[in-house]
């Protein structure tokens, strides 16, 4: 329920966080389940946020288990349809919890849902494809639903990491009949074949984007300059907090986006209340200008250094 409600707002927020998001083969965003989305994983939770925001149907995401350690993190992530899955590096004692993740994935798929798994099983803040884990192949091999399962490869890439106003390239591949990816009797042989085939499908979909070549006119640049200084105190505070919380991790972009998603509406609410107390009409006009200026900042400059 919460996921469905906030998804449109996430799409709006992405337009203030990313300079441009290019999507190829958009028609596949309308596909219905059961679908296992297999994607690369260059930028932590932001990958899932972007893919989920543009898909028409709800998506459930398999996400790294160490992000679920704190109760409030666990609560929030589960509201976003995220399911924890653990790697050996996150503690051998947690590996038994993966049975829950795979069982949940099977239930979702057997009920005609969509599950997203990042087949590399690791995020290194790079568009370079990493070695594959066996989780995606396991889900396909264990699937027992009545409706044929499709596997949809998606490549996602960024022009920069740990930075604002990024350009994103997302390319959706062709849906593949899962049975064609596991044609053998031996489970181990099927896993190797599955990963090899998916790599062949996924590699061409990862296209390094160039920074969006947007050349605003002088008025847009002027508005962005005003907006830059209007937002600078908020941006500085959020930036410093995000850096402190994500030091030596890959979560900076995800945490920065999450903070802005929550705090920027509060910022606008406070400014709006102050302006409304002074003049309702002019307060509304100025508030609209502030919102427009925020978008022009993304087009013209990087407000966080």
Identify the function of each model-found stretch.
Residues 4-10, 14-176, 225, 239-305:
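Soluble catalytic domains of membrane acyltransferases
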Residues 167, 193, 197, 217, ...:
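Generic recognition of short, well-ordered alpha-helical interface segments
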Residues 168-175, 180-190:
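Long hydrophobic alpha-helical segments that form multi-pass transmembrane helix bundles
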Residues 176-180, 215-220:
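Extracytoplasmic/lumenal ectodomains and periplasmic regions of secretory and membrane proteins
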Residues 184-204, 212:
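Long, charge-rich alpha-helical interaction segments
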Residues 200-214, 237-242:
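Juxtamembrane amphipathic/hinge helix adjacent to a transmembrane helix
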Residues 216-244:
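Core alpha-helical transmembrane segments of integral membrane proteins
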